[in-house]
Each structure stands twice: as structure tokens, then as C-alpha cells.
């Protein structure tokens, strides 16, 4: 696994950034470590995103331990990518 840390950042860390983290973990874990976070959190990640990722890509974000986090909750990234907002 690479030591490069990539963080996907959006407002609530409930949908876009969670999807990006999941794809990063499943498709590029040999290239970088994926994280996601937001400037605010939600009680749970978007259930439509969870369902679609599971149905279309067989990626279970909740079983993989993903949850809504603040930027201060993750390691300092080498690369931060804003997911809009």
C-alpha cells in the first residue's frame, strides 16, 4: 500500500466524498490511501449512495466501516480534492 494520503472533501461527508473514498479504496489502494471528510457531518452516509454502490459495484461502504467524518478526524492528506459544494 502507498503512503500517499488522498482526502475527498465535501460539505457533509455523506455522499460524493464517501463514494470517492470507496472507489479509491477498491480501485487504487495500491496507489494511495483514500479518506473522506466534510466540514460538517451527517448521522449516517446517504443511503441511496450506499445502495447504488452495493448494487452496481458490489462495494458495501457501511460494511467497510465508512461513516461521516470531519476534516479534523482524518490524517493530514498529501492531496485534498474538493467534491464541490
Model-based region annotation:
Residues 1-85:
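Short polar/charged helix/loop
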